[in-house]
Amino acid sequence: MNGSADAGPRPRKYVFITGGVVSSLGKGILTSSLGALLRARGYRVTAIKIDPYVNVDAGTMRPYEHGEVFVTADGAETDLDIGHYERFLDMDLSRGNNLTTGQVYLSVIQKERRGEYLSQTVQVIPHITDEIKERIRKVAEEQKAEIVVVEVGGTVGDIESLPFLEAIRQFRFDEGEGNTLYLHLTLVPYLETSEEFKTKPTQHSVATLRGVGIQPDILVLRSARPVPEEVRRKVALFTNVRPGHVFSSPTVEHLYEVPLLLEEQGLGRAVERALGLEAVIPNLSFWQEAVRVLKHPERTVKIAIAGKYVKMPDAYLSLLEALRHAGIKNRARVEVKWVDAESLEAADLDEAFRDVSGILVPGGFGVRGIEGKVRAAQYARERKIPYLGICLGLQIAVIEFARNVAGLKGANSTEFDPHTPHPVIDLMPEQLEVEGLGGTMRLGDWPMRIKPGTLLHRLYGKEEVLERHRHRYEVNPLYVDGLERAGLVVSATTPGMRGRGAGLVEAIELKDHPFFLGLQSHPEFKSRPMRPSPPFVGFVEAALAYQERA
């Protein structure tokens, strides 16, 4: 940590973030923002998300219920908050950074079956709580973190969270008061009718937290508008928290404002003080510039996302963030027009895409809306509108090209039509004998070998890159030569994949198009505010150019 080099190693610090009153207050953004403030002070930080559900991971959950599944470099299917952590901290996390009830109980039961608890009665305390603490410490050690920020999902008072709250309570007993900090995020509603903030829900939430043995050191009050100083002092008095340790987190236009807003109020210094750390002035210049561009862009461009889950934008959270990062890089604001892919099957496409300068077809599963996505890809190809296809979006582009350019009537994916005469998209050979759904796809970082002279090579500026993946189907290698003869450019492959000759198709593009790119990977998962994804930067740049021509 910061300080004298001869002071010797210092104890690791732990910050535990809980939430009260209602769920979905933004604990993930608060955790990410605090992590960013500590990183800006030069500390090595990691963040862990605790999810109290019994699922082992988020891989099989419905996007409409849980939002996107974020994939880590090591192939874990995790909660979307892990994506927030990676973007704000600008670092790769791992499967250990998302801890679930399912993982904990599965591990404890397996240990019991192996005889590791021989002669013991296995109980929530100490066996479950010890497993939780062991997993948190293991991540901290593996990632060489000086400060570990742990978000406890759910709401204080939920029965599912009790073992985790007990485990983090024990951390103070194990590590000492100066090495642990409890931060509680809670709702302070503002009543328009009486024009006042109501603090009673927060008081009850803190009382519930104290009932399980945790006295919060810091409170962050979530509200639609800034909570005034006198209200914060009242909350401090009734919750036994220092007045200078109660902060306001109002709704903001851009989430990248949150670290700046909290730092301006002194949250970073309060955490330093509570953990016995030296005062360090953070370097927040990037965040300040990013917010300036978002609030005062030089240009604005509209992109259509033709997807299946358009009524739940969180299902495409990393896509939206990657577009935002690309917009910042191009000093532009990216507006998104949500287009229900199913509606495109019979829609007037001129009307559906009338005011957009780019079309993006995201990843997804299932047959619903597929033909609408095919029509969107055809429209982009024929009208020379910039097109970016992600995962399924690449497969859609190949299906459309095969049908309408290569002359393969009825071409399709075996996922949607098992009896198609031309299975240009087919199940990967490695997936033929896979049983079960959870964690069984081609997941995580895989290498892409890029062909020189292609659009993709211009975007990345190198011949091999790593990108995240999450798929079971691929471009059928038996059709690649014929598609290339018809004019499709295979601009990247993964070398050495079994039974594929030149390798699994990772990217396709068109020569006679200003920007038509399909990627089997999910580059949005590696896009960061400081290091935006090259395909997204190029896509937004092309959309801006198209807008100027139009």
Swiss-Prot record:
Protein name: CTP synthase
Enzyme class of the recorded protein, top EC level: ligase
Protein's pathway: Pyrimidine metabolism; CTP biosynthesis via de novo pathway; CTP from UDP: step 2/2
Binding residue positions for CTP: S23, D158, I159, E160, K198, T199, K200, P201, T202, Q203, K234
Organism: Thermus thermophilus (strain ATCC 27634 / DSM 579 / HB8)
Catalytic activity: UTP + L-glutamine + ATP + H2O = CTP + L-glutamate + ADP + phosphate + 2 H(+); L-glutamine + H2O = L-glutamate + NH4(+); UTP + NH4(+) + ATP = CTP + ADP + phosphate + 2 H(+)
CDD domains: CTPS_N (cd03113), GATase1_CTP_Synthase (cd01746)
Boundaries of every Glutamine amidotransferase type-1 domain copy: 302-549
Additional free-text comment from the UniProt record: CTPSs have evolved a hybrid strategy for distinguishing between UTP and CTP. The overlapping regions of the product feedback inhibitory and substrate sites recognize a common feature in both compounds, the triphosphate moiety. To differentiate isosteric substrate and product pyrimidine rings, an additional pocket far from the expected kinase/ligase catalytic site, specifically recognizes the cytosine and ribose portions of the product inhibitor.
GO-annotated biological processes: 'de novo' CTP biosynthetic process; pyrimidine nucleobase biosynthetic process
